[in-house]
Amino acid sequence: PGWKMPADIRLQLRDNTLILSDNGGRSLYFEHLFPGEDGYSRSESLWLVRGGMAKLDEGHRLAALWQALPEELHLSPHRYLATNSPQGPWWVLGWCERVPEADEVLPAPLPPYRVLTGLVDRFGRTQTFHREAAGEFSGEITGVTDGAGRHFRLVLTTQAQRAEEARQQAISGGTEPSAFPDTLPGYTEYGRDNGIRLSAVWLTHDPEYPDNLPAAPLVRYGWTPRGELAAVYDRSNTQVRSFTYDDKYRGRMVAHRHTGRPEIRYRYDSDGRVTEQLNPAGLSYTYQYEKDRITITDSLDRREVLHTAGEGGLKRVVKKEHADGSVTQSQFDAVGRLKAQTDAAGRTTEYSPDVVTGLITRITTPDGRASAFYYNHHSQLTSATGTDGLEIRREYDES
């Protein structure tokens, strides 16, 4: 019902296992790593590397990216770094400082987990997340410093603070206060919910224009009494997005609107799947779900059928029946990468991905002719040979 940042990840350190989780509910398991060792998830194409090494082996795909890290990061065995590409960025997993208890023995041991403390791109530019050390927002990100030295303050609010603000606004406006509870359920189907939400983002320091900082937040967020994102306002305090939710199911969005555009509405089945997408100014769609099959019909009565195979994150569309009656089919390998596609005329094109990177190294057309692709350690295309035998080459500078 709240909001999430795709890169907001957390690492649990157990005796023989490392568990990398995001706040979308995904968890990846890695074996224990020694300093400088790495683990790789083929299903997610993601590396996890433990610090404590000045350089990685020269032939390692992440060797160049590793050198982009500040020395204090790649030399620290207590930090872990994750990336899904040899071109970066690195997600830096460390720990946030906290205020020790009065009777606590110091120095306190490091916690058995790591949280996101920053990002580093392949040019060495950093983005640092500052977390509160104490108080009601302890451990939460309340500040960000970017690579240009600009500092942004993230204003967080609790459910009780938003409830009090709603009551004060009602009193000052001479209206009856609406029902706005002081607390939210501590646990929902989306996971634990402490009721803390991002309410505004301010630019508080800009080294280029230190005396010309904006007098208003860059963006502001409004929330429903149930903690759902209700509206987004830009720096001129103009509402640019709005959201509506199901009365019965907390967090289930039933409508959204961009300012100046029509409202898009959604209907759901008893399993929480979208059955209708209604657009008053364009095409609307209905969705019918069966086992390994989804039927999509638009408001012009055109129908497509998607046939799926696999489970969870490896579920893929293996066959598509188009509105014109034609059928296309796709094949995937064990980790969900495309291997072949067959068009409506029965012609098959084959794809050969690299075992480690997933990058396409060869495409074979239905008539047996092949194209080949070659990459550098940054996963950048360096040369390609077409079916006609012609070759193209690309060169890149050091940056």
Regions found by a protein language model. Name each.
Residues P1-A7, L11-S399:
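Extended charged/polar low-complexity repeat regions
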